[in-house]
C-alpha cells in the first residue's frame, strides 16, 4: 500500500516540517508528499477551484481519496486505524490524503473524497496538519501491528 499527501503550499524549514519528516521516516508504508501551488494570482472560489485541479492531478488515478476538512468526520485513532486496515486488507494500492489551502477545499474535492476527515472542530495551520496526519498514520500503523505506541 502506497500513501500520498497532496498539499497546498511549500513547507519551509522549521518545526512543522521537521514534525512531518519525523513521522514520515518512521512509517513502514511509503508516503510521498506532493506540494502544489497556484501560479496565477486569483482569490476566493476561483483559487479554490485552481487548487482543487492541482491537488487532484497530484494523486494517482483510482486512489482512495481522504480529504482533510474541518466539516469532515472526527475519528478516534482506533477508528482511523481500522479504516486504514480495511483499505490495506482490500489490497488498495494507493491512498491519497489532500490538504487544501487557507481558503479550504473546493466542493469538487469534497465530493470526490471517499472520506472527509477532521482533526476536531478547531482550525489548524495547514503546515502543522501535515505533521499531525503523519503522526496519526504512524499511530494507526502501530495500532494495527499491536505495538504499545498507542496507549489510549
Swiss-Prot record:
Pfam families documented for this protein: SPOUT_MTase
Gene3D superfamilies xref list: 3.40.1280.10
Gene Ontology terms for molecular function: rRNA (pseudouridine-N3-)-methyltransferase activity
UniProtKB keywords: Cytoplasm, Methyltransferase, rRNA processing, S-adenosyl-L-methionine, Transferase
Catalytic activity: pseudouridine(1915) in 23S rRNA + S-adenosyl-L-methionine = N(3)-methylpseudouridine(1915) in 23S rRNA + S-adenosyl-L-homocysteine + H(+)
Residues annotated to bind S-adenosyl-L-methionine: 68, 100, 119-124
Localization of this protein: Cytoplasm
E.C. designation(s): 2.1.1.177
InterPro entries: Alpha/beta_knot_MTases, RlmH-like, tRNA_m1G_MTases_N
Listed transmembrane segments: none
A Gene Ontology cellular-component term: cytoplasm
CDD domains registered for this protein in UniProt: RlmH-like (cd18081)
Subunit text: Homodimer.
Entry's family note: Belongs to the RNA methyltransferase RlmH family.
Function: Specifically methylates the pseudouridine at position 1915 (m3Psi1915) in 23S rRNA.
NCBIfam families documented for this protein: PRK00103.2-3
HAMAP family: 23SrRNA_methyltr_H (MF_00658)
Name assigned to this protein: Ribosomal RNA large subunit methyltransferase H
Organism encoding this protein: Rhodospirillum centenum (strain ATCC 51521 / SW)
Gene symbol of the encoding locus: rlmH
Amino acid at each position: 500500500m502506497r500513501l500520498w499527501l497532496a498539499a497546498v503550499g511549500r513547507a519551509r524549514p522549521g518545526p512543522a516540517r521537521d514534525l512531518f519528516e519525523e513521522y514520515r521516516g518512521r512509517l513502514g508504508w511509503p508516503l510521498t508528499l506532493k506540494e502544489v501551488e497556484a501560479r496565477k494570482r486569483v482569490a476566493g472560489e476561483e483559487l479554490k477551484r485552481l487548487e482543487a485541479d492541482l491537488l487532484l492531478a497530484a494523486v494517482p488515478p483510482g486512489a482512495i481519496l481522504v480529504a482533510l476538512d474541518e466539516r469532515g468526520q472526527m475519528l478516534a485513532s482506533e477508528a482511523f486505524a481500522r479504516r486504514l486496515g480495511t483499505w490495506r486488507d482490500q489490497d488498495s494500492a494507493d491512498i491519497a490524503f489532500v490538504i487544501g489551502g487557507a481558503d479550504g477545499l473546493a466542493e469538487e474535492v469534497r465530493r470526490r473524497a471517499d472520506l472527509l476527515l477532521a482533526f476536531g472542530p478547531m482550525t489548524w495551520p495547514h503546515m502543522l496538519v501535515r505533521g499531525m496526519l503523519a503522526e496519526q498514520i504512524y499511530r494507526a500503523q502501530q495500532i494495527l501491528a499491536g505495538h504499545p505506541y498507542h496507549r489510549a
